[in-house]
Amino acid sequence: MNFSGKYQVQTQENYEAFMKAVGMPDDIIQKGKDIKGVSEIVQNGKHFKFIITAGSKVIQNEFTLGEECEMEFMTGEKIKAVVQQEGDNKLVTTFKGIKSVTEFNGDTVTSTMTKGDVVFKRVSKRI
């Protein structure tokens, strides 16, 4: 399955609680909670580029499945992680006590991030 495309956030659950759990300042949480960000994904074999635009903030991360890489987290912090593919439609990684699962189903992408007992879920649609 090729994951390439542009996707816009449609819904999100537990945004504020998750952002607080990862240390995001309250003023940034309030500014970002209603932004319907756009993610552009470019896949070339096992290599991926994610360009995430939320308001004026742009985060660009590149990785190759199964290889350690450095990525920018939503807090602006640089993290090291290894992204794995599970089955035909899931990208999974764990970093700093956070498990991230991105699942592709047709034109819908469901991203779930879990830290402790706080689960943040974001659903995006292809645009």
From Swiss-Prot:
GO terms for biological process: cellular response to hydrogen peroxide; cellular response to hypoxia; fatty acid transport. Transmembrane segments: none annotated. Keywords: Acetylation, Cytoplasm, Isopeptide bond, Lipid-binding, Phosphoprotein, Transport. SUPFAM superfamilies: Lipocalins. The modification N6-succinyllysine is found at K31, K36, K46, K57, K78, K90, K121. The modification Phosphoserine is found at S39, S56, S100. GO terms for molecular function: antioxidant activity; chromatin binding; fatty acid binding. There is a cross-link at N105-G106 (Isoaspartyl glycine isopeptide (Asn-Gly)). The keyword 4Fe-4S does not apply. The modification Deamidated asparagine is found at N105. GO terms for cellular component: cytosol; nucleoplasm; nucleus. Monomer. Belongs to the calycin superfamily. Fatty-acid binding protein (FABP) family. Forms a beta-barrel structure that accommodates hydrophobic ligands in its interior. This is Fatty acid-binding protein, liver.
